Structure formats: structure tokens, C-alpha cells
């Protein structure tokens, strides 16, 4: 039986918030980095996004779960977040697409959550103090004890979390039946020739694969630790470096592989973590943001052009390190003027810090997938 029981959120500095949970039959304590997302919609895509691995996500929008959960809007095959914080979680949801409620979904995967706290106050506190580790508990409500437990968990800086989310095997991806919300693309003529794309899986979202599939690409997904020679043996027309969690500078094997791939002059498109790893391979630097960029309304642009973008990252590429290289800054995050996109001045490499595949979020940057296609077509033409 699901009933409301007391729960507590404790931050590593001792700050705590008392609230409630609907997990009467599960006594759970979880620790992770407490972050916030400002999106009004898309909670299902957010909680299944592998980039949120090891994080407790605070939703700033006050009502979460109103439209339930369905099997079409997931971004991976499991819940990725460590915990969920909300002002209110709807116990009974309503949508013609729903298959279960958010509460049922979280309980099925044993993901702890807390609601009934002042999420506005929590978000403002994280903005002032920066993201930090925290704990959700509905078992032991002693905040001093929980603070000590938090101190035993490492911070995000220096953590390589990719092995927890990458595929263990290489596989070809071809989604036979696209979700109902892909109707426009389902009926669209595939005007592009079959281009072979290798996706290096640092924690790839499904909608990245869907976008490539609807543009006619042959997609092979490979583990993040795949040796360079195995990638090249597939004779790809292009390589996509996916999103993923953790500190990019700790992914030494990924940086090494990309460095070796750069010598082949094959088109490379990096998204989020892939953007950071590509820039690290090109000898740029990354750093941890104070509270990150997580939401679906982040303005990005350059030269009087603005895109509203979906973003989810706690690290960024250092601007000064980019300017010293043969790289061009193609986009800035216009909220804080951090690097949001780069391109190489002489080679077919480009990347963005945000998510052009959206899910959730606007489609302003969707053109980048078609740009990738055009670069690959040119590469194939020159190779022949």
C-alpha cells in the first residue's frame, strides 16, 4: 500500500529540508550530487537521461508527474537519476498516453524521492552555494548522521562515470517503429543516401539515435572503451560522440581514442560530454560550473543569432584554452557567456554543449544533424 511517510533531504554542509514520500514499503537512503532542472515539462525524459547518473534532481516547476509515464518518452531503458526532489508529485496522473504513474515508476525502480519542500528556496541556495552532495532518506531522519554519511561519498570532480552507463557490446541500432510523436519524420522521404555512423556511447540518449535513423543513417553503437582500430574497421562515414555523466577530464581512454581518430580526418560530431571530450582531445581544457546548466530554455548563439536549447551539464570547456587552438567558438551560452559550441577551422570536427535532439526541449538546433549529414556526404564524395 502506498501512503505518505516523512522523508528528509540533507545537504553536505548540514542544510536540510523535511518533506514527504510515497514509499511506505521501501526504506531507502540515497546519496548523490544535488542539482536542479528548470524545465516545466519533460520529467520522464530527464529522469531516464544517462547524463543524470549519480545525481539527485530537483525540479523547479512545482507540479511533477501530472501526465504519468509511458514507454515512448524514455531516453534509456532504465531510470538514471539517484533521487528526485519536487514541490509536489502527483499521485494520480491523467493522460491518454500514460501507462503508470510517476510514483509507481519510481517505486518500481526503487528510486527515492521527496516532495513537500520549498524547492524555490533549495534552488536559490544551490545557486548561491553551488551544487553539492546530498542525501534523501525516508528511513533514518537524523540529519547529523546523514551528513556524516554524505562525507563518505566522493564529489563529481574527477569521477569517471561512463562505465556505469555505456553499452557493454557493439550493436546496430534500427528502431522499427518510431514513437507516435515522430509522425512528421515517419512520413518524410529519406532523401539522404545510407551513411554509416559510429556512435561512441558515453551514455547516449535514444533520441540522438532516432534523429540519425530518420535521416537515413546506418547506426552502429559502440562501447566508450572501444579501441580505435575497431572503430576504423567499420569504415564509418562519420562518428558521433554522445552525451554522458561525470567529469570529462577523467575519461582518459575516451580522450585517447578521439585523439587517434582526429588523425583520420573523419567527420566527428560531439554532443554534451562528446563536445567536452572532443575539445579535450584537441588540447582544450574543461572546468566545473558552479551550479551547471540544466533546463530547456537556455539561449545559445553567436553574431546576433540565438537558439533556445535544451542543456544538461555540470562541466564546460574553458574559453581561453579554446582561443589558443585552431578552434572557432560557434556558440556561447548567452546566460553566462560560457562556450556552447566549437568547430575546427580546417577539419570536419564540430560539437555543441547542448542537446540538438531535445527530448525534452525545443528543436531550434535540430539542423545540426542535417549539417552532420552534409559533412559526411562531402567526406564520402572526396574519399571516392
UniProtKB/Swiss-Prot annotation:
Keyword set, alphabetical order: Amino-acid biosynthesis, Arginine biosynthesis, ATP-binding, Chloroplast, Glutamine amidotransferase, Ligase, Nucleotide-binding, Plastid, Pyrimidine biosynthesis
Binding site for L-glutamine: 51, 244, 246, 273, 276, 312, 314-315
UniProt pathway: Amino-acid biosynthesis; L-arginine biosynthesis; carbamoyl phosphate from bicarbonate: step 1/1; Pyrimidine metabolism; UMP biosynthesis via de novo pathway; (S)-dihydroorotate from bicarbonate: step 1/3
Reaction equation(s) it catalyzes: hydrogencarbonate + L-glutamine + 2 ATP + H2O = carbamoyl phosphate + L-glutamate + 2 ADP + phosphate + 2 H(+)
Keyword ATP-binding: yes
GO cellular component: chloroplast
SMART domains hit by this protein: CPSase_sm_chain
EC number: 6.3.5.5
One Gene Ontology term of the molecular function aspect: carbamoyl-phosphate synthase (glutamine-hydrolyzing) activity
Places the protein is found: Plastid, Chloroplast
Biological process, per Gene Ontology: 'de novo' pyrimidine nucleobase biosynthetic process; 'de novo' UMP biosynthetic process; glutamine metabolic process; L-arginine biosynthetic process
Enzyme class, spelled out: ligase
Active site: 272, 355, 357
Region (CPSase): 1-192
Biological role stated in the UniProt entry: Small subunit of the glutamine-dependent carbamoyl phosphate synthetase (CPSase). CPSase catalyzes the formation of carbamoyl phosphate from the ammonia moiety of glutamine, carbonate, and phosphate donated by ATP, constituting the first step of 2 biosynthetic pathways, one leading to arginine and/or urea and the other to pyrimidine nucleotides. The small subunit (glutamine amidotransferase) binds and cleaves glutamine to supply the large subunit with the substrate ammonia.
PANTHER family, per the entry: CARBAMOYL-PHOSPHATE SYNTHASE SMALL CHAIN (PTHR43418:SF7), MULTIFUNCTIONAL TRYPTOPHAN BIOSYNTHESIS PROTEIN-RELATED (PTHR43418)
Similarity comment: family membership: Belongs to the CarA family.
Subunit structure: Composed of two chains; the small (or glutamine) chain promotes the hydrolysis of glutamine to ammonia, which is used by the large (or ammonia) chain to synthesize carbamoyl phosphate. Tetramer of heterodimers (alpha,beta)4.
Protein name: Carbamoyl phosphate synthase small chain
Organism field: Porphyra purpurea (Red seaweed)
Gene of this entry: carA
